[in-house]
């Protein structure tokens, strides 16, 4: 029993680590973008912005990049932290690994032309289903950790928007900023604030998921 318990623990840790994805941490990605933006390095900020987006992005003016980076950060945190933890609690290591494989399957479709549109649509739709509950719990945690009324208003106003935009606008709303109805001229300080908000929300979110597991989710 002892060795089985140790083996299960090791497997769980490895599965959770895998589900968080490889490469740099979110903190490192934010730091890379911030440093590049402050020294005015267009090529480096484009690369760092793509890392936060998890995919190649269209070139944009440096003045617009902090707002884009802030939106990408919320979605990146969902994919690399919040959703894997949720599925680990809900279904154990299999759930966390399954979620990560679903993320990789979608990425494969986005980067390989021979995957075909049907594959890409199916992979995106499947991942959207897996993100449905984590998105809502994460939005709640962001609202509780930040400006609740502004976050709630953003969530309601973007009801008909794609899931990623809805989540990012809710996160920006939790910072006390309005829904994007025009240029907001967000600064690099907003990205730092978003990163701090995510840390607070993560602690709250883990507590929410743990409470949910007591009622049959885990």
Annotate each language-model stretch with its function.
Residues 1-218:
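Hydrophobic N-terminal alpha-helices or hydrophobic patches in metabolic proteins across all domains
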């Amino acid at each position: 029993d002892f060795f089985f318990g140790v083996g299960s623990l090791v497997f769980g840790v490895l599965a959770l680590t895998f589900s968080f994805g490889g490469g740099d941490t979110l903190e490192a990605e934010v730091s890379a973008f911030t440093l590049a933006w402050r020294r005015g390095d267009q090529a480096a900020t484009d690369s760092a912005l793509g890392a936060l987006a998890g995919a190649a992005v269209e070139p944009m003016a440096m003045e617009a990049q902090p707002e884009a980076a802030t939106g990408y950060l919320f979605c990146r945190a969902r994919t690399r932290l919040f959703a894997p933890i949720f599925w680990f609690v809900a279904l154990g290591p299999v759930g966390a690994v399954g979620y990560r494989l679903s993320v990789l399957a979608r990425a494969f479709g986005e980067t390989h032309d021979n995957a075909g549109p049907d594959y890409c649509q199916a992979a995106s739709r499947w991942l959207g289903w897996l993100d449905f509950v984590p998105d809502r719990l994460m939005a709640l945690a962001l609202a509780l950790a930040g400006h609740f009324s502004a976050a709630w208003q953003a969530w309601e106003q973007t009801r008909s928007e794609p899931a990623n935009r809805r989540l990012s606008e809710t996160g920006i709303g939790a910072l006390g900023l309005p829904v994007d109805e025009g240029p907001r001229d967000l600064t690099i300080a907003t990205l730092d604030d978003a990163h701090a908000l995510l840390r607070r929300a993560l602690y709250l979110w883990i507590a929410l998921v743990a409470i949910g597991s007591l009622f049959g989710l885990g």
